[in-house]
Amino acid sequence: MLRHTVMWRFHEQAEGAEKGVNIEKAKALLLSCAHVVPGIRAFVVATATPGMDCTHDVVLHMLVDDAQVLAAYQNHPQHVAIKPFMKAVVQERCCMDFVV
């Protein structure tokens, strides 16, 4: 099994919208990809809790069967379609994949 974790920090304003609006849109777009390929065992999208000490605004945690499933997810048209929006609204992205 492989764990895929991505964290994003958003611009205060981008694409004509405030940060909070873009965070909610990003969360919905990411969640729409939860079942696009077989082999995704867990798919969690969370947003920073107000008042907590957070360095990023949104986190994605995925558990997949193997690297082939992750590659299929990353290349799936539905996932590829959200990348332009994410690139426009995100200030910083951090990613880590590891075997569990």
Give the positions of each predicted feature.
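Interfacial aromatic-anchored transmembrane helix boundaries in multi-pass membrane proteins
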Residues: 91-96
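C-terminal structural segments of small proteins and small subunits
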Residues: 64-89
